[in-house]
Amino acid sequence: METWQEVTVHVHRDAQEAVSHVLIETGSQGVAIADSADYIGQKDRFGELYPDVEQSDMIAITAYYPSSTNLADVTVTINEQLAELASFGLQVGQVTVDSQELAEEDWADNWKKYYEPARITHDLTIVPSWTDYDASAGEKVIKLDPGMAFGTGTHPTTKMSLFAVEQILRGGETVIDVGTGSGVLSIASSLLGAKTIYAYDLDDVAVRVAQENIDLNQGTDNIHVAAGDLLKGVSQEADVIVANILADILVLLTDDAYRLVKDQGYLILSGIISEKLDMVLEAAFSAGFFLETHMIQGEWNALVFKKTDDISGVIGG
């Protein structure tokens, strides 16, 4: 029977998705995230018992590695990557190593216990893939396998992206999802009525994970996933382009986004920490976009831009 080793990273909540990705890149086969915020306002809808958890901005991300992994080497690499993330302005922390060995079935039980269905927007609820869930009238359920490290859709940047997509889509649109990760924004776009969605990610792992999550959701055959470096080489025009990635990367795609967004179309940018906000705004304005909506949650910002000649309905118009 295969056994597993644990590596736990204690970081600020804002770094959740970036650090989870680092752990997968170093060979982790899955992660579990313990976040006190997950228990805020939880209700025992079906008789669940939720623990009394002290609230903190810090979270614990536990990664699981095969027993053959050299954890000393992995820890060095993780610390180097955390230092790089810190240079981007993300709040990170120190690595603690727990070399406890777990049987494979124990590992599965360990990480699954952290996840519950979560209502993200008015219409969208994210549900772990193994959970039976009875949706209410009008509720759109996104099935995700959060054990694949790209987040559960509950991070502030993802929440704001989902809210923006929900507000914009009316049905029949073409959507491009840049840096798709788990595929959650593409799945949401499909459920909200988009006609065709193109999902791109530079990471082959993300491409695979996104496709696996898409396959969990019925009626999402209109999502096309492919490896891609932002919008380079893309010629397909879109009504909406959405990107939830680091600000330093967002500024590299605004010109291509303007080229591809149809007139009266939208560009949704999220993943922007406050200190990088002006940089992203400048890049989008320089490309020709007008700002329509600015959302803020904690230190995170999401921006909705419009490609239009009629600026009466946009900020500053």
UniProtKB/Swiss-Prot annotation:
The gene is prmA. It comes from Streptococcus pyogenes serotype M4 (strain MGAS10750). It is an enzyme of class 2 (transferase). Belongs to the methyltransferase superfamily. PrmA family. Gene3D superfamilies: Vaccinia Virus protein VP39. It comes from the Bacteria. Its main location: cytoplasm. GO terms for cellular component: cytoplasm. Its EC number is 2.1.1.-. S-adenosyl-L-methionine binds at T158, G179, D201, N244. This is Ribosomal protein L11 methyltransferase. GO terms for molecular function: protein-lysine N-methyltransferase activity. Keywords: Cytoplasm, Methyltransferase, S-adenosyl-L-methionine, Transferase. The keyword S-adenosyl-L-methionine applies.
